[in-house]
Amino acid sequence: MILVDTSVWIDFFNGHQSVESAYLRTCISDAHPLVVPGLVLTEILMGLRTESDATRVADGLSGFDEAPPLDTRDSRKAAQIYRECRNRGRTIRSTIDCVIAQLCLRHGYELLAKDRDFESIAQVFPLRRVAIPMMVHDRPNPKSQQS
């Protein structure tokens, strides 16, 4: 199962051409199991301008699996991720990224993200990042073909 970070969803919804958003598009069309944590949903919805957009996006994302709720153990482990990275010279900029990394570590999710904080975390913890196949780079974006 793949946990998709906010950075990739934003590119996807905005039609931004990135390798990660192209891979997400492939995962959706191939019905690959994806998980959306509540924190990611919150971040996505915070960036939308209208309630109608927020409702439409929330409804669309509700079709994917929801990550299990956080517990105290996750909070402690996320703080540990931050401290251990900082102690190794890799300061993580986002508390939420530490929590998302912890969810991936705890539940065995692969992570699809663009955020450099996850690169730093993966240097210290066994965070599994999605290896995007080269052929995804060659797939056309359906939006770019519409005139």
Where are these regions (language model features)?
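Active-site neighborhoods of divalent-metal-dependent phosphate/nucleic-acid chemistry enzymes
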Residues: E66-L112, Q146-S147
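Amphipathic alpha-helical recognition patches that constitute DNA-binding helices
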Residues: Y23, T95, V99, D117
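Acidic, PIN/NYN-like endoribonuclease modules and their adjacent C-terminal/linker elements
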Residues: M1, A101, L105-S147
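A general structural signal for well-ordered alpha-helical segments in protein cores
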Residues: S21, L41, A54, S75-A79, ...
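A generic structural signal for short hydrophobic patches within well-formed alpha-helices
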Residues: W9-I10, L41-I44, F118
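Short beta-strand scaffold positions
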Residues: V4, V36, P69, L112-A113
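Short, well-structured N-terminal submotif of metal-dependent ribonuclease cores
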Residues: M1-V36, M46-D59, D138-R139
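Generic structural signal for small/hydrophobic residues in well-ordered secondary structure
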Residues: D5-T6, I44, A78, C104
